[in-house]
Amino acid sequence: MKILISDNISLELFCKNPIKILEKSNKGIIGVLKNKSPIFYVITPYILKKIFDLECNLLDLDKTKQQISKKFSMHPQWTPDKDFIRQAALWGITLTEEILESELASFISYWQAEGCFFHHIQWQQKLARSLQKSRSISYMSQKKRDITYIPTPDQTVPNGFRGK
C-alpha cells in the first residue's frame, strides 16, 4: 500500500522527542530518515485505524454482487465505495484527501455524456486516476514561478576567486 508521506525528519531529531514530533505532523505519518533515506515510518494509532479498519467499511453483499456481476453506464446516483481511498492506494494511486462533491459531479457528468459501460471497480479506478491527474495539475499550477521576475545578483565574491 502506498501512502503519501509529507513529513520527514532525521533520526537524531526524532529520537529527542518522538511523541511531540508525531503530534506536530500534518497527517499523523512521519518518515524517519538516516543519511537522506527512509529507515522507518511512524504512524499515529488514529491513522492506522483509519487505514486498516475494514469493519466499518463493509458494504452490503447484495449491492456488491450486483455491481460486480454486470457492466453499467454512468448515472447520477453512482458513488464510489466507502473505502475508495484505501482501494486507490492498493492500485498505486495516492489520494490524500476525500473526494469533493464537485470532483465527483464533474466525473459523473463527463462519463454520463460518453455513454461507456464498465464494471463498478473500473469506474472507481477511472475516478482515482482522474482525481490523481486533476489534483497534480492544480498542485503544479500553484508552484509556477513568476516569469516577470528579474533576479538581482549579489555582489559577493566567493573565497578562492579573484575579485575587487
From Swiss-Prot:
GO cellular component: primosome complex
Keyword DNA repair: no
Keywords: DNA replication, DNA-binding, Primosome
GO BP annotations listed: DNA replication, synthesis of primer
Tree of life domain: Bacteria
InterPro entries assigned: DnaT, DnaT_DNA_bind
Protein family (similarity comment): Belongs to the DnaT family.
UniProt-listed HAMAP family: DnaT (MF_01061)
Function: Involved in the restart of stalled replication forks, which reloads the replicative helicase on sites other than the origin of replication. Can function in multiple replication restart pathways. Displaces ssDNA from a PriB-ssDNA complex. Probably forms a spiral filament on ssDNA.
Oligomer status and interactors: Homooligomerizes. Interacts with PriB. Component of the replication restart primosome. Primosome assembly occurs via a 'hand-off' mechanism. PriA binds to replication forks, subsequently PriB then DnaT bind; DnaT then displaces ssDNA to generate the helicase loading substrate.
Name this protein carries in UniProt: Replication restart protein DnaT
Organism field: Buchnera aphidicola subsp. Acyrthosiphon pisum (strain APS)
Gene that this sequence comes from: dnaT
